[in-house]
Amino acid sequence: MIEDKGPRVTDYFVVAGLTDTSTLLDQEINRLDTKSTGPKAPITDIAIIIKSAGETVPEGYTCVEATPSALQANLNYGSLKSPELFLCYKRGRDKPPLTDIGVLYEGKERLIPGCEVILATPYGRCANVNNSSTTSQRIFITYRRAPPVRPQNSLAVTDICVIVTSKGETPPHTFCKVDKNLNCGMWGSSVFLCYKKSVPASNAIAYKAGLIFRYPEEDYESFPLSESDVPLFCLPMGATIECWDPETKYPLPVFSTFVLTGSSAKKVYGAAIQFYEPYSRELLSEKQLMHLGLLTPVERKMVSKSINTNKCICLLSHWPFFEAFRKFLMFIYKLSVSGPHPLPIEKHISHFMQNIPFPSPQRPRILVQLSVHDALILSQPVSTPLPLSGANFSTLLMNLGPENCATLLLFVLLESKILLHSLRPAVLTGVAEAVVAMIFPFQWQCPYIPLCPLSLAAVLSAPLPFIVGVDSRYFDLHDPPQDVVCIDLDTNMLYVSDEKKNMNWKQLPKKPCKNLLSTLKKLYPQLSSVHQKTQEGSAIDMTPIEADFSWQKKMTQLEMEIQEAFLRFMASILKGYRTYLRPITEAPSNKATAADSLFDRQGFLKSRDRAYAKFYTLLSKTQIFIRFIEECSFVSDKDTGLAFFDDCIEKLFPDKGTEKTDKVDFDSAEDTRLIELDDSQKSEHTVFIMPPEPPPDDGKDLSPKYSYKYFPRLDLKLFDRPQELKLCFSRHPTGNSITKSPPLMAKRTKQEIKTAHKLAKRCYTNPPQWAKCLFSHCYSLWFICLPAYVRVSHPKVRALQQAYDVLIKMRKTDVDPLDEVCYRVVMQLCGLWGHPVLAVRVLFEMKTARIKPNAITYGYYNKVVLESPWPSSTRSGIFLWTKVRNVVRGLAQFRQPLKKTVQRSQVSSISGGQSDQGYGSKDELIKDDAEIHVPEEQAARELITKTKMQTEEVCDASAIVAKHSQPSPEPHSPTEPPAWGSSIVKVPSGIFDVNSRKSSTGSISNVLFSTQDPVEDAVFGEATNLKKNGDRGEKRQKHFPERSCSFSSESRAGMLLKKSSLDSNSSEMAIMMGADAKILTAALTCPKTSLLHIARTHSFENVSCHLPDSRTCMSESTWNPEHRSSPVPEMLEESQELLEPVVDDVPKTTATVDTYESLLSDSNSNQSRDLKTVSKDLRNKRSSLYGIAKVVQREDVETGLDPLSLLATECTGGKTPDSEDKLFSPVIARNLADEIESYMNLKSPLGSKSSSMELHREENRESGMTTAFIHALERRSSLPLDHGSPAQENPESEKSSPAVSRSKTFTGRFKQQTPSRTHKERSTSLSALVRSSPHGSLGSVVNSLSGLKLDNILSGPKIDVLKSGMKQAATVASKMWVAVASAYSYSDDEEETNRDYSFPAGLEDHILGENISPNTSISGLVPSELTQSNTSLGSSSSSGDVGKLHYPTGEVPFPRGMKGQDFEKSDHGSSQNTSMSSIYQNCAMEVLMSSCSQCRACGALVYDEEIMAGWTADDSNLNTACPFCKSNFLPLLNIEFKDLRGSASFFLKPSTSGDSLQSGSIPLANESLEHKPVSSLAEPDLINFMDFPKHNQIITEETGSAVEPSDEIKRASGDVQTMKISSVPNSLSKRNVSLTRSHSVGGPLQNIDFTQRPFHGISTVSLPNSLQEVVDPLGKRPNPPPVSVPYLSPLVLRKELESLLENEGDQVIHTSSFINQHPIIFWNLVWYFRRLDLPSNLPGLILTSEHCNEGVQLPLSSLSQDSKLVYIQLLWDNINLHQEPREPLYVSWRNFNSEKKSSLLSEEQQETSTLVETIRQSIQHNNVLKPINLLSQQMKPGMKRQRSLYREILFLSLVSLGRENIDIEAFDNEYGIAYNSLSSEILERLQKIDAPPSASVEWCRKCFGAPLI
């Protein structure tokens, strides 16, 4: 067997003919009814006799007495006085026969040359046959005789008859009518002559043909040669031995084609040439000689006649290249009768079969030069969704005419027996193929033999429908059966039995038939003109090749137009049929596949035209219709064709085809082209193939020459051995090379690709549509990668559920799918992994989205439902446990109101907006919008429910309730926005950018700056004044987002600092963390410290389990003013709310809860405790985060919830000026000792989880919740802060929350620390801190604990380290606190503008302050606690990014090790707490990505949404258009890495002291990959700090004053102004040692004395490298070098991705080579998946890639786990590209904010500071004009700028006021109005880049949301 290597032009070369074993054909056909007469001799003479004159029939003649219907055959039939004329004929072989008979109208026509006229009768009378008077014109009969020497196969007249058409007679079968009436008089009937032509029968013996030779000898695997059948089709009339007259010439070869249909309905096309060769007389027996007439019967004398036999050479192929094959076979035949030739025939055959490449789209034409004079062209088959066929519609129409074609269509549709016949065998196959193709989408189901061999003619008697083609000579031997419809292609006639006489085209539905006929009648004349032109002299005007090309082009065009006419007809009669398909929606029964179960036949019939009910009824009962319904209902190889047919119906009848009619805006149906040529068909690209090389001529004439007289016996030795076919030009093999998985699931049909291309072109001109088109393509990318994602996911059900959730998310976010690939892939995966119920849900989701599944999707759906195992019973364990869960949840709901009231009384909280969203948070954000007005209780309830569901454990209900009582998450806060019109600043509690994105008006009323919730206001009032709070919030918000907002310090430390992760919005954080992130966000918003911790924990865990869901939860949460007081509760509430909305949107909502749950579960035993803690933290967070959005930032955190912060607060409480703002009720604090103890237990692998849990339980539930939350936050400390969250939510709260940020993530500042908060809050923070990072956190804790008697508190071996550290720290702490507090308060104040809820700070603080009880009054807590939180220790110092936030003391970042702990849990089975810190700690790599690019032409910075708007609808164009100079350039994605694996924290091993927060590097399975990485990164910072318990320096965070970094550190950090850490050897306790880490910078907070923390490295994702270098004694790994790849439009990326997967299989996505070999596709996918918050395992490839491991490819372990270790931040700006001397305003603001000592600022800095402050205030008052004027005044005329005023003001607003508080749409409106109102003087000073963004840019941002700034 020969292996198949892709498409071949030809498969086999065959020679057939007479063999030694051939049997007589008569034996084969004796069974048939043969005519008794046998073949007749041809007619040699005709005559006219006048019977009325007494003339008789001449001798030897036969008179035609009667017509076929037995009327008198009088040529003047029906005339009154005319003579009776009759026609006589004579047969014989003695002279040449007649070849034609005609009628001559004398005087009107001239006689054709070669014809003779019968002027007289044999008796001399005039032979005028006209019945009119003698005076009128005469009519004579003419004839033409064959020449004496003629070819054997020439036709002759073999029969003659007369018909009277006025009596209804028609020509008999196979007779040709002479279309001239013989009677032209007034009277008489219409009489016509008919005659039949055939090949005169010679003496012959017919045998069954056999195989003489084949090449190659071996069979192909896919198509073995049938050696017995093929020869029959090569010689359908048999292999004959014939005896010819001596003067007979050899006929020219006859070309014929045939089709072999295999059992699988696959067609093989044959092209054959028949010719004659002499046969030796010696080989004949006497019997044969007698039969042939070569031996006289009596004398036995030999007769001198020639003996010949026929032979055939044939090519077999899967492709109908009939014309090319004809030319090649003729070339071979000519070689066989000529010579000499340098090469044998065998060489030419093997060259053609092996060396000719298959035509491909790149090389659509192959010109094969066979010899000097012979060439042929192979053209790529027309690529349409219609089935491939050898149909020749033009031949069909030319031979039958329009009306006969329509009648034939009726017969085929109603499944009649159809017999096609012609004397031209080459015509039969093309016409038969056209007859079968014209009923598309139906497929003929019965016997189909286009050229039937005589030996198979018995099929004509079969009792079932068939389409068969035969040679017309068959009728010389046999009469056709009565019930067969015979179509004579030679005479353009249809012959029908009597019962079908009345069946014709008029029975077809009127309108469709009328349209069909009109089109065919229009095309009919064009066909004849094309044929005439090509015959007439085209060869004279152009070369044969050119003539060939042009003729082929015209014919192809006509072919398609004819085929399209039939396609329109079929679409018209079947329109709307999909409505009547019945999907299987339950476990299938035996009758599920019956046609009546699958299709509503009665409904379909009722919807059709009643006048044609009979036609439709008959049609619906045919096999073709029933099969069509089955193919529509199940997967079949016809699916692409059926989908194309559905598209045709939709184009022609937009109202009937689908419900989704908005896509159809085509021209009128008449003009719509249904079949379109590929571009490749129009291509002139031709490959030239030379003939085989002759042997070298060395002049000695030794090389043999080949000369032939007849066709030789071929010698296999002379053939070239079959090589592998050269597929250099060929397309990829049709068989998929993909192993294991089914062929590319997400593959689009060609039609879908074309439709998407058209749609994109149409959308391109419409800004909203263009943005949605890009958005939709991005979702498609995710679904294309889904099969691979599911394959590496465990369990599969969760991955499938995630996919389903994404589908719901798409619908809810108004994504208009470009095709059905998304749904189809999910359905196929449901089948692959056996989840039919989910497939049913997907189908109903399609219906909900008003999308009608096309044939492909519907087929896969039914296949899945039919073949997959259905669950046996609803009473499964899952079902029963679900019932239990519902009962428990119901009980919890009843308890909520009670707890809420308690909480409210206890807590006064600031409401926070959502913190940054998790990976999948966008959806949630949007949802939040809707939920903004949901009451807090409801939100809380939802949150609780979800949380419970996810954990599947009953968490402390009270804690949850507390959460609920907290202010509802940000989303809700917008309810209270002021009534100002289009205000830029939203309500503080407003969500991030998402909310505004979803609807600029929404509840926000398009406010530029949102107002706070009433609750928020109250809280703010408590805190101090709104203004202060706002500032704080701003600062705080800054922190979290800032952290990862910028690229690394290496590239530009300053940039990084500014963009540090802290800057990143909480939403970013959320994005990274998944659902947990959202929770974190909320937490941040509340008391920053505890929230931070909480958030961290939450997001990581949630992320791991259910990224999307958890995220959703977060976003959706609302803040309730009442609840704001307790940060933790708020957070929980928020998450709940988020969850619920998400749930509506997508199951992912549940995921949020799950995430939350998973966080808890991450630390297995810790789960319950953590959960409690989380809820508490959430509450706290909420309060502290004024807007959840700000939660992540801890800028405002004055008093952290973490133990350190609390301690600090206690110590410095009174000292902080802002402390009043931050009064936290002491209730929040928990028992510090308990917390620490439990925390330690958690961390240590040996510690008993239960004990730690008990400790938590002992504390009030709220505290427990807080603690958990805090942990989460801790984890998150490294997460970026939400930009939005900071200032936007509530200025006041921001200010108040200035507590020290613990981690970079939490850059909250706590301006004032609330004494009341001190004790308990601190303890909370401490415990949280400890949990997250036993060592590092502890250190910070110690600092804050200065006031506590740690000896008493701490006991047991685990606490030894903590004790010693704390003692030392305590002494220093009080002093440090003062400094730190002051610094913080300063930054807090700035931040106040931002608002407490700045995500980062709040979140971290919360995390740290796990102990804080939810009840604690959060108003105070927010600012101070956040500031205090130790977690954010390193954040403020680390980088400017953190911005102004100093988290000197409180910021001790939790080492990422926390995350490691989670890993450890899974690895070592120890239950570690899953606090945010741990999440951060588990982060091994932070990846910062920005699409901001620089235009090559004008140098301007072009941002993401501008790049999107500049892309074109061309899926091959990589360029975008610069919005300013309109030039094209290639945008780039810039990627930077912060490798945190070298940090000790990441690799911490569990230690006896329980400090091993950084337990393994392996995340828990339940943690979501993406989130984890983020958190772990941040965490390590915090944790590092735990190594040196003494170094709690940053604890000062709580105090409110920041420690000044030492000069060395300042130098080291470069622009990182926030970093004010001095590396203190052992005295970490020194205040100056505070570390700030900026997410974007990427350095660790290692300013702390590393000597003391040998095993935890602080890994700060965004810390500046310089910082890392200075601080990291461990010798952290160098960061991998940055990467830049082209930023591809989703259209281009999709095309490339599909091509890649088709060539390499979809498993390539999750192989280690993907990132190395396809970096462009990889990074673009990572960018888009992250952009849309879609779960993905791709980030896991980053960790093991060569690039990130110094050129060594590490083995892949667990993608899902590794992905959790990578935190990806998408940055809006790229400071590395900034080339202006002045730094961006938002960077300046961050820097001023972080260093809050105005006395230290230079004069220039002071001016800038004033400018920035003025702009901020203007924006708050909705005034954009003033900032434009101020900035324009500062511009130097004529100096080219990169940064536009628009970006300067917008970015400053987002960073300083909090991203969640800015309505970007409102800002755009205000900016546009202000710009248009500028005076011409100012406009002259402005540049093009300062113009407002275009509508297209705005829509792209609205669709995709804004990245982090």
From Swiss-Prot:
Compositionally biased residues, Polar residues: 1296-1316
Post-translational modification Phosphoserine, affected residues: 703, 737, 741, 965, 968, 973, 989, 996, 1003, 1046, 1061, 1099, 1126, 1184, 1225, 1244, 1252, 1278, 1325, 1337, 1346, 1623, 1627, 1629, 1640, 1799
SMART domains referenced in this protein's UniProt entry, alphabetically: dDENN, DENN, uDENN
Compositionally biased tracts (Basic and acidic residues): 1459-1468
Residues annotated as domain cDENN: 385-521
Pfam families linked: dDENN, DENN, uDENN
Keywords associated with the record: Cell membrane, Cytoplasm, Cytoplasmic vesicle, Guanine-nucleotide releasing factor, Membrane, Phosphoprotein, Protein transport, Transport
InterPro entries on file: cDENN_dom, dDENN_dom, DENN_C, DENN_Domain_GEFs, MABP, TPR-like_helical_dom_sf, Tripartite_DENN, uDENN_dom
Keyword Cytoplasm attached: yes
Domain dDENN: 523-641
Cysteines joined through disulfide linkages: none
GO cellular component, one term: intracellular membrane-bounded organelle
Biased composition (Low complexity): 1426-1440
Region annotated Disordered, chain positions: 1243-1263, 1277-1338, 1419-1474
GO biological process entries: cellular response to insulin stimulus; protein localization to plasma membrane; protein transport; regulation of Rab protein signal transduction
Domain MABP as annotated: residue spans: 40-199
Listed PROSITE patterns: DENN, MABP
Post-translational modification (record): Phosphorylated in response to insulin.
Record PTM Phosphothreonine, positions in chain: T975
Start and end residues of each uDENN domain: 191-364
GO molecular function per UniProt: guanyl-nucleotide exchange factor activity
Its job: Guanine nucleotide exchange factor (GEF) activating RAB10. Promotes the exchange of GDP to GTP, converting inactive GDP-bound RAB10 into its active GTP-bound form. Thereby, stimulates SLC2A4/GLUT4 glucose transporter-enriched vesicles delivery to the plasma membrane in response to insulin.
Protein name as annotated: DENN domain-containing protein 4C
Lineage of origin: Eukaryota, Metazoa, Chordata, Craniata, Vertebrata
